[in-house]
Regions:
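A short amphipathic helical element positioned immediately N-terminal to and/or at the very start
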Residues: 5-16, 270-278
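Small-residue-rich transmembrane alpha-helices
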Residues: 31-43, 76-78, 87, 113-142, ...
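Juxtamembrane interface at the cytosolic side of transmembrane helices
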Residues: 76, 82-84, 176, 222, ...
Length: 673
């Protein structure tokens, strides 16, 4: 008897190959992708790279997403596969097999599936992991390594994780069988055929959740707010999407049916009545397709736009090859002599054989303020980006402005040049206790990190250094009275360098280890920070390259899951529609009318998720725009083009997949019992 179970399990899988092969393919692909992601995240070569740590962190996040998503997609496909076999299990039960015997058969089926999925999945991981490592290295600017990339640790973790997952799938299937009786299993194929009831409360709740999620996105206009608002908005939209497909769609269709002028037409009559039943059976699956489609669009469009905008961001972040910032003690009001420090810097670059060019030096004071119309109230608090009225104020004198731009300007006392990345100011600005007459600038060559992070910044050019110090004194007086951080007078020294990145980095290391540099800074009573493009850009490229790789990787996973759900929906709809096809012909409809009616229903049902995903993206655009702003992308036009391009490509792929699976659907519909 026991030898019968393995043979019966193999026969069952072969007989159900139309449903089983896609399920097995899903298992193989998910195993391979998980193992590849785990292999890349734990690649020791990344740890040895100078800037590989950030990439490992990004990929480690991807492993967590893959683990969660693997469980979700395998439970979905397994439940779909099991649902199609309920009648088969009922017949076994009626013919005399006990439920424990069916469990033995299910055990062998699961064992076959797990063995094939792990074997072929790990083989595929071994084949493609090296290729994907080369792609990753190309994106992050690393060098390719030789040898097989997959490691025993990755294989072991994959086997343990999916072994446990397949065990849970088996236990869940056995639970379903043991909790059902043969009559319930025989009727499972026709469950849901009764007309669904209108669920007004759920429909209203779905509309409210969608509206709330959309409203959060539309009202988010600060970059750092966008990050904390993203997940609540996503959760609301996901809940709203499921409730909309499950409840609101039925309510709308029934409302159309009550409209006699619309409903009692040949095409509308059959289409609306058929869609009521189709949406009842397929609402959750269609909502899942919509959510997955939205995830593909968001993931790919954001990572592509960030990577495409990398160089533009770097040019803003590092306007020159080297930036040295000398900061005075905030407790002193003296202007330090920084010339000895700068001489050490220049001498170090000369000894390294590097030539300086485009040398600029200027003094600035930075402090925070709260905007109210054309007035700025001084504040000693740190900038958080928690308000659209929060500004970082950067003040420099006309000498520094001339050094930066080459433009000589003359300002009278109480007058200032002004440029802001926020809303324009009027003719005057009240700052602290003073009122400044403003002359607006069309552009400004100095962009601070606050602009990059999405915080508003105001740049003021005042007549002389004394005016700079006066504004600093006002801010420090406010800080002394209310507590908080006093502002510092900074001297920024910037220049470009000849030579390679490695030569520039060597020169920087030489400078920082030079006792003369330390002693000159101490003598001037200044602290310092250095920022070199040759040091920061590779880290930035590695991080954004890792994001792009993860975006495409997860985008492929989400797309694969979408294709899988569409296939199962088409096949299950095909089997369900075989009987309806005959019934509609028997009541007088011609085969051409029947086919047109069913085609209309299927088209509306399967393209509704794509249309809904497009609506989600349109409403999410303001929120996602602020998030990419926080990561440094300030080019809205580029982000819009990437979003539209991603949607266009995805819509073509979606249509192609639909047409392929539709062929399977029509073959099933035309089959005879």
């Amino acid at each position: 008897m026991r030898n019968l179970y393995p043979r019966l399990a193999a026969t069952n899988l072969k007989k159900n190959r139309r449903f089983y092969l896609p399920y097995l393919l899903a298992c193989i692909v998910i195993v391979a992708l998980f193992c590849i992601m785990l292999t890349l995240a734990s690649d020791p070569y990344l740890g040895q790279m100078q800037h590989g740590g950030s990439v490992s962190q990004v990929l480690g996040f991807g492993v967590s997403i893959m683990a969660l998503f693997s469980a979700i997609i395998l439970f979905y496909t397994n439940s779909t596969f099991t649902k199609q076999r309920k009648r088969e299990f009922a017949i076994y039960n009626i013919l005399g097999m006990e439920k424990r015997h069916i469990s033995y058969v299910l055990f062998w089926e699961s064992l076959y599936t797990a063995a094939m999925a792990l074997f072929f999945g790990l083989v595929a991981a071994g084949v493609f992991s090296k290729l994907l490592q080369l792609v990753l290295m190309r994106l992050i600017g690393g060098e390719a390594t030789f040898g097989l990339n997959i490691r025993l640790m990755s294989i072991g973790c994959t086997v343990v994780f999916f072994g446990a997952l397949f065990l849970l799938l088996l236990l869940n299937t056995i639970r379903i069988i043991h909790l059902s009786n043969p009559v319930q299993l025989l009727r499972a194929g026709s469950e849901g055929e009764r007309e669904p009831r209108s669920k007004w409360i759920l429909a209203l709740l779905g509309a409210v959740c969608l509206a709330a999620g959309y409203l959060i996105s539309l009202r988010t206009n600060v970059a750092l707010y966008a990050i904390q608002n993203f997940f609540p908005a996503v959760i609301l939209v996901i809940i709203g999407t499921y409730l909309t497909f499950i409840a609101l769609s039925i309510v709308v269709l029934k409302a159309l049916r009550k409209n006699r002028r619309y409903y009692y037409k040949t095409s509308h009559f059959a289409t609306v009545s058929g869609l009521i039943y189709r949406m009842s059976r397929n609402a959750a699956g269609l909502a899942s397709i919509c959510i997955l489609s939205t995830m593909v669009l968001v993931t790919v469009s954001t990572t592509v736009s960030l990577y495409k905008g990398l160089d533009a961001y770097a040019d803003v972040r590092w306007p020159q090859d080297m930036t040295l910032t000398l900061m005075t003690d905030p407790r002193t009001n003296t202007v330090p002599d920084v010339a000895p420090v700068l001489r050490v810097v220049d001498d170090t670059m000369t000894r390294a054989g590097l030539t300086q060019s485009n040398v600029h030096g200027y003094r600035t004071v930075r402090f925070s303020a709260q905007r109210s119309g054309d007035a700025l109230d001084l504040t000693s608090e740190q900038l958080t980006g928690s308000s659209a009225d929060e500004y970082a104020v950067m003040v420099l004198d006309t000498e520094g402005y001339a050094d930066l731009t080459g433009e000589q300007v003359t300002l009278s006392p109480g007058e200032a040049l002004a440029w802001t990345d926020g809303a324009a100011f009027g003719d005057t600005l009240t700052l602290g206790g003073d009122t400044l007459r403003l002359r607006p600038l069309d552009s400004f060559s100095l962009v601070s990190g606050s602009s990059i992070m999405g915080l508003h910044t105001l740049y003021l050019v005042v007549p002389d250094l004394d005016s700079v110090l006066e504004l600093r004194a006002q801010q420090n007086a406010y800080a002394n009275e209310h507590g908080g951080t006093r502002s510092m007078l900074n001297y920024t020294y910037q220049f470009d360098l000849s030579g390679t990145d490695d030569e520039q980095l060597d020169a920087l290391h030489t400078l920082l280890s030079d006792p003369a540099f330390e002693s000159s800074a101490e003598a001037a009573n200044v602290n310092y920070t250095t920022d070199m493009r040759a040091d920061g850009y590779p880290t930035l490229r590695s991080t954004y390259g890792g994001f792009l790789f993860l975006g495409f990787f997860l985008g492929f996973v989400f797309l694969f899951a979408t294709v899988l759900i569409i296939y199962y929906k088409q096949v299950s709809e095909g089997y369900d529609d075989r009987g309806r096809f005959r019934i509609m012909q028997q009541v007088g409809m011609t085969p051409k009318e029947v086919k047109a009616t069913i085609r209309t229903q299927v088209l509306l049902m399967f393209f509704l998720p794509l249309v809904t995903a497009a609506i989600h993206i349109a409403f999410a655009f303001p929120l996602i725009k602020q998030i990419v702003f926080a990561f440094g992308l300030q080019n809205v036009h580029l982000f819009l083009l990437c979003t539209l391009g991603t949607f266009g490509v995805f819509a073509l792929l979606y249509t192609f997949v639909y047409l392929l699976t539709a062929r399977t659907y029509y073959r099933i519909v035309r089959m005879t019992d």
